[in-house]
């Protein structure tokens, strides 16, 4: 018994719940016999490392990622509006959702969870802000941020003033304004 997954599907343009499913998630590797024909679709053995490369619901990718990472028992709530992932909550905590971007930075309409986006190399938006001010000696100085030791990339390195991922539905400007408020306490 690995986890509980709650699926909620709302109608598009409405908060009406069309479908709700409470799923107990099990894994099994100690079984006997061979699968029989399935009237619900085609059965196929797929290598564990290939699963996330299949055409899956974005929420399914979250719990497959958790299983691959040997996450202990978890509770995952997935809310969809139509076929689009709108919210993901893991163990009572909101997960970060990004809108996938095309090569030119425009939104594709596909919403992905942060861990899935990073593990699959999916293009998503970020906003980077350089803050500078005039000074009398050199003419200009730039506010830099030394990255925390706990950061997953380049801990302890100096970086730009502020940066962060765009939340699903945000524009680049909205993301930039949110980040300088969250990281630096600035208001714009």
Regions found by a protein language model. Give the residues of each.
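The catalytic Nudix box helix
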Residues: 1-4, 26, 47, 144, ...
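Acidic pyrophosphate-coordinating catalytic loop
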Residues: 5-21, 118-122, 152-153
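Active-site-adjacent beta-strand/loop module that shapes the phosphate/pyrophosphate-binding cleft
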Residues: 9-34, 105-106, 188
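Short, well-ordered beta-strand micro-motif
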Residues: 25-29, 45, 131-133
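NUDIX/MutT-family hydrolases
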Residues: 27, 36-66, 89-94
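Charged phosphate-binding loop/patch that engages nucleotide di/tri-phosphates or the phosphate backbone
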Residues: 69-95
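Acidic, metal-coordinating catalytic segment for phosphate/diphosphate chemistry
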Residues: 94-137
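A glycine-rich, hydrophobic loop/mini-helix early in the fold
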Residues: 126-162
């Amino acid at each position: 018994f690995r986890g509980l997954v709650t699926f909620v599907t709302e109608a598009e343009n409405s908060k009406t719940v069309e479908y709700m499913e409470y799923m107990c998630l099990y894994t099994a590797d100690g079984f006997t016999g061979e699968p029989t024909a399935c009237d619900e679709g085609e059965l196929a053995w797929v290598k564990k490392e290939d699963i996330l490369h299949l055409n899956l619901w974005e929420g399914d990718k979250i719990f497959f990622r958790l299983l691959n990472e040997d996450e202990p028992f978890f509770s995952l709530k997935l809310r969809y509006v139509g076929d689009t992932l709108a919210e993901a909550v893991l163990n009572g905590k909101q997960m970060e959702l990004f809108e996938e971007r095309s090569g030119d930075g425009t939104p594709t309409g596909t919403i992905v969870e942060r861990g899935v986006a990073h593990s699959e190399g999916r293009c998503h938006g970020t906003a980077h802000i350089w803050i500078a001010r005039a000074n009398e000696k050199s003419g200009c100085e730039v506010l830099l941020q030394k990255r925390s030791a706990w950061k997953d990339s380049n801990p302890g390195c100096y970086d730009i003033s502020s940066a962060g991922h765009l939340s699903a539905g945000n524009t680049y400007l909205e993301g930039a304004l949110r980040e300088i408020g969250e990281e630096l306490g600035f208001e714009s």
